[in-house]
Regions:
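P-loop NTPase motor domains
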Residues: 1-180, 184-187, 242, 246-252
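Flexible loop/turn segments at secondary-structure boundaries
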Residues: 52, 114-117, 155-158, 197-200, ...
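Conserved ATP-driven motor cores of ASCE-family P-loop NTPases powering translocation/secretion/packaging/pilus
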Residues: 170-264
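Short, surface-exposed linear segments at secondary-structure transitions and domain or protein termini
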Residues: 265-273
Length: 273
């Protein structure tokens, strides 16, 4: 039952776009000459996909009992994404312009999303859209450059645990591959996290430059220390770093170096224009 759920959702999404006049194969809208002029009418929203999903399930002739199980499982899960803060972000006719956002200083705060899985979902959706926008801009301008800072990255790029769903493993693997891919499009991804041991191994491997501040937990010191060629003695020294000190390593270096920032950053300074 679980195995067929993604295919039902995929069919519902495709049908929802077809209902709005889209030819999926040609990427053209049959109802409007220029659908981008009126996007609110030419693209389905989350609640419309849910209604289509009900029709898709009913069309499969699963039998009453199995149909009710599918509806109860899928609809209840997805309907939650149309409520509250998630609903305002996902179940909407208009969206923020990601391409315009690339040329501005933008902070996206997800504090109002209390559930960890919801934060993971939104981070994944945003990162995916940013990556596509970066690719598009780089095609027009090969000198295009952009920086994205991903804070608390373990929410999205956590190390898969034994017994976890295969979908999460695939998601982590996909975004790990994305990290390695976007560099050639002028994108710089900065991943900040206080618990490196929670990050997927692909993330630690695919980052070019690593800056390590004081770490106390042994598993964290070994997780990051192994990726920057630290000896056991050097890993133990990570507990002794002072404020403003860090261990820095970049690809191609023979060994990591210890650095100290002369002047601490003043976080009370005026905002940057």
């Amino acid at each position: 039952m679980e195995a067929s759920m993604p295919y039902l959702i995929e069919e519902a999404i495709v049908r929802s776009y077809q209902d709005k006049g889209w030819d999926i194969n040609q990427n053209e809208n049959l109802f409007y000459d220029n659908p981008w002029e009126n996007p609110s009418e030419c693209f389905p929203i989350f609640s419309e996909v849910l209604e289509t999903l009900k029709d898709v399930i009913a069309s499969k002739n699963f039998g009453r009992e199995l149909q009710e199980k599918y509806e109860g499982s899928l609809i209840s899960r997805l309907d939650n994404s149309t409520l509250g803060a998630k609903g305002k972000m996902l179940n909407t006719r208009t969206s923020i312009n990601i391409k315009e956002m690339l040329y501005k200083k933008v902070v996206i705060e997800l504090e109002d999303l209390r559930d960890e899985q919801d934060k993971c979902l939104m981070m994944g959706l945003l990162l995916g859209r940013i990556a596509e926008a970066v690719k598009h801009e780089h095609k027009k301008n090969h000198n295009f450059q952009h920086i994205t800072l991903l804070e608390e990255a373990h929410r999205l790029l956590s190390k898969p645990q034994a017994g976890e769903e295969g979908s999460k493993r695939l998601g982590v693997e996909m975004f790990g591959n994305l990290l390695a891919e976007v560099r050639k499009y002028g994108e710089c991804l900065i991943i900040a996290d206080q618990i490196p041991n929670k990050l997927a191994p692909e993330v630690l491997k695919n980052t070019n430059t690593k800056i390590v501040h004081r770490l106390f937990a042994s598993d964290d010191r070994h997780a990051i220390g192994d990726t920057i060629r630290l000896s056991d003695e050097q890993k133990d020294f990570l507990t002794m770093l002072q404020a403003g000190e860090a261990i820095v390593y970049s690809a191609g270096w023979h060994e990591a170096v210890r650095v100290k920032i002369d002047k601490p950053t003043d976080t009370n300074a005026p905002e940057i224009d």
